[in-house]
C-alpha cells in the first residue's frame, strides 16, 4: 500500500475481472498477495469494483455488461457457492445486481464478486474451481516460495502477472511460475508506461489454444501466416 506497484496491481485486477464481465480465458481468478496487505488490498479492490457501472453496453456510462446468458449467470453463481467452501465473500452481492441501465429481470447482470481465502494452502476449491465471470479470490502468502506454490496449485494457466519493484523477488517468482504458465508478465512503475496489460496478446506470440478463433496463431504476427499453410 502506498506504492505505485500496489495501485497498478489493484487497477489491473479490477480491469481483468470486469472486461467482458470476466468471460475470458486470461481473466484473473486468483489474487495472491502478501498477508500484511490483506486489509488494504481487500478495501482498495472492493472499493474499485464497487464503482463499476453495470448495465446495457449501449449506455456510454456503463463499464461492464451482462454475462452471455441467464444460464451462464446461474452457472457462475453455482461456482461462487463452490468457492465459498474455502472462502468468504468480502465484496459484491452475487444475487442482487446493481445496474445503471437495462432490465434487471431479463438481463444476465452480475456484480463483480471478490472472495477471501485465509488458508489457501489447505484449500482446494479456490485452486480448482473457475467461475467464468467477474469473480476472483484473494489469498495471502508469507514467503515468495509459498506464493509460487499457491500459483502452481492452479495446475497451469495462460498467463500470470507479478507486480513488484524488487528485482530479486521478481527473479525468484518468475522462475518458479514459468513452467506452469504460458506467459509471465512483470508489472512495475517502469514497465507500466508501455505495458499492454495482463490479458493482452503480444505480437509474435501465440495466444490461446484451438478454438473458434483458430489455433492460437492468428494473433501471432508473421507466425499467423503459418496458420493458413500446409506444414509437414
What is the role of each PLM region?
Residues 1-121, 149, 177, 222, ...:
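ALDH superfamily catalytic-core signature
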Residues 4, 15, 47-48, 53, ...:
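Conserved C-terminal structural/oligomerization subdomain of aldehyde/semialdehyde dehydrogenase
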